Amino acid sequence: MKIILWLCVFGLFLATLFPVSWQMPVESGLSSEDSASSESFASKIKRHSDGTFTSDLSKQMEEEAVRLFIEWLKNGGPSSGAPPPSG
């Protein structure tokens, strides 16, 4: 039983000597992939902010269309002869 314990301790010791980076060599400096991924990250942030703005604008336009439609209904709706608001 002591042999198994010592083998486990020795295995842990060896694991600390050979880290995971030993299996996959670390590239020195920035590669083109790194710079591309950083550009991609920046473009994703920009796209997200553009999408957020577009989403907010769409929501605001929908709310305005609903408000106009409700006003149209209050003012007589289809019986008034006026066409429904487009939007």
Swiss-Prot record:
Keywords: Amidation, Cleavage on pair of basic residues, G-protein coupled receptor impairing toxin, Hypotensive agent, Secreted, Signal, Toxin. InterPro entries: Glucagon_GIP_secretin_VIP. The keyword Signal applies. Expressed by the venom gland. [Lys(40)((68)Ga-DOTA)]exendin-3 is a promising tracer to visualize insulinomas (neuroendocrine tumors derived from pancreatic beta-cells in which GLP1R is expressed at >90%) with PET imaging. It is found in: Secreted. GO terms for cellular component: extracellular region. One of its GO terms (biological process) is regulation of blood pressure. Transmembrane segments: none annotated. Residues 1-21 form the signal peptide. The modification Serine amide is found at residue 86. Stimulates vasoactive intestinal peptide (VIP) receptors in high concentrations (>100 nM), resulting in both an increase in cAMP and amylase secretion from pancreatic acini, although at low concentrations (between 0.3 and 3 nM) it increases cAMP without stimulating amylase release. Stimulates the GLP-1 receptor (GLP1R). Induces hypotension that is mediated by relaxation of cardiac smooth muscle. Belongs to the glucagon family. This is Exendin-3. It comes from Heloderma horridum horridum.
